[in-house]
Curated annotation (Swiss-Prot):
The gene is mnmC. Keywords: Cytoplasm, FAD, Flavoprotein, Methyltransferase, Multifunctional enzyme, Oxidoreductase, S-adenosyl-L-methionine, Transferase, tRNA processing. It comes from the Bacteria. Pfam families: DAO, Methyltransf_30. One of its GO terms (biological process) is tRNA wobble uridine modification. InterPro entries: FAD-dep_OxRdtase, FAD/NAD-bd_sf, MnmC-like_methylTransf, SAM-dependent_MTases_sf, tRNA_MAMT_biosynth_bifunc_MnmC, tRNA_MNMC2, tRNA_S-uridine_synth_MnmC_C. It comes from Salmonella typhimurium (strain LT2 / SGSC1412 / ATCC 700720). This is tRNA 5-methylaminomethyl-2-thiouridine biosynthesis bifunctional protein MnmC.
Amino acid sequence: MKQYAIQPATLEFNAEGTPVSRDFDDVYFSNDNGLEETRYVFLGGNRLAERFPVHSHPLFIVAESGFGTGLNFLTLWQAFDSFRSAHPQATLQRLHFISFEKFPLTRDDLALAHQHWPELAPWAEQLQAQWPLPLPGCHRLLLDRGRVTLDLWFGDINELTDQLDATLNQTVDAWFLDGFAPAKNPDMWTPNLFNAMARLARPGATLATFTSAGFVRRGLQEAGFTMQKRKGFGRKREMLCGVMEQHLMPTLSAPWFYRSGSEKRETAIIGGGIASALLSLALLRRGWQVTLYCADDQPAQGASGNRQGALYPLLSKHDAAINRFFPTAFTFARRLYDALPVSFDHDWCGVTQLGWDEKSQQKIAQMLSLALPAGLASALNAEEAEQAVGVTTRCGGITYPAGGWLCPEQLTRAVIALATEQGLQTRFRHTLTSLVAQESRWQLRFTSGETASHETVVLANGHQINRFDQTQPLPVYAVGGQVSHIPTTPALSALRQVLCYDGYLTPQNPHNQQHCIGASYHRGDESTVWREEDQRQNRQRLLDCFPDAKWATEVDVSGNSARCGVRCATRDHLPMVGNVPDYHATLTHYADLADNKTSAAPAPVYPGLFMLGALGSRGLCSAPLCAEILAAQMSNEPIPLDAGTLAALNPNRLWVRKLLKGKAVK
């Protein structure tokens, strides 16, 4: 099954050195002067030079059809940098660029194409460094320390625009209608695309395109744009420009999963782990005032406090939402961790998941049938696995070459320290007991008797997320576990990658000459008391999976060194990110949802109350993207995920799925 494969572009370079698509027999940019044409058609056609200084919002959003070589984006980024240098006090502070590409270039072809424009090299090199793997869906790239956001949507634009979340409606300030010429690629230039452009355009939004084809002009007019012709670039006689002068009212296709944000820019985050830390950074980048309340006397005392944690994507043999979310989350996490200006112990040494018995082999075979890019995951036979991991296991599996391990405790503390430098206020030894809605604010009450008032609140406090009246009905559960710390030996030190089986074993951390092996799993148990039986079982699972491996017998847990923590999980293994749903209102308002879908109102939620939780055992993989999703939602900005996958992360999903089928919610 090839549902997760994206076909890269096949191209050649002509005599002028211009890339030409073999699939469409068309150039990616003009042989004459592609850079100047971009400036004239797209920047000039949208009047960006005159609009930037008077833009009344901190963010300007541009959407594009056909990313190609990225010439339009790089040219715009260069112009935006010049604007920011000339107008440092302007309201407009950040640029958000959304682009769709069916056949993305390889990184090597991208670099070759960029050689055409030496003046764009400072921006092109940053793009090349973060160029994503050819996975379907949205890839968010945070560039220029977060001042520029690039959302690359890989896939067919006419399919992708139908999958966009409703929060993107009426957000785009300018459209770059680009791509191969209509005569070369008629499948793209459709009424469906023109209608999607109109749906996403805010009132007053503009568009520009190089073509003057009559059917394009008429299609855009019918969609709602006011169109006019303009002199074309160079030898081209005409081009088209447009303005969205209407105020369209798009309908919500799935109001029960609708996400609402806040016009306010002040929040309290409850928690102290990696999710809280990364969310703080994401909100601060958007200009929020953030106060972090942590029950402990320092960060990373809960599930984020381990010495080594594996980073690799969760894949499923049958769950499409898991297979859409986790590969994207993993690649985003790697980009974010690499870009963070903080230090923490880590090694992107790779992760190999082994098929040690028939059941695990079948599971891995089904995962490999997803046809994921080799840069994300690929098959290994027994011999290849031994070469990759450095120890003998006598079984093959699946390897994640970009995975590895990191120290969650160090990462969490470093990120919170960085956020504090950027304005984060921290309040340690503050255990929240209740939340009380007071007009348009939330009052927080703590065990000390102290209270605080905030415009919005985010619950990101791990397995304690359902301790409040508003969250008590959430279908989440605690999972206690113990990770053992073992000394390295000459045989164990040969391990080069994180090894996953019916447990996991990390390579040694050179800073302490120890490995981590784990982890036990006790559903419903919130105890953090060390257990001798867990220590023994962590070792025994390794021996049971690899009974002939002599190196495995050197695992020594007798030192009784371990760390106990509690995860927060869900039945479907996906996080919960978004508005905190109002359980009783949901059941009341949606009692007849199965029979009245067309008249359903937006999902009942607690205004200004959000959550980021249920990260399970994959928080290091999912927390970065979840934090970015929630920060974007709270800020009413584009969310980097399709509507279907976002629905699978909605905290109300398990209730709504039953209500949609007319089943009782228990």
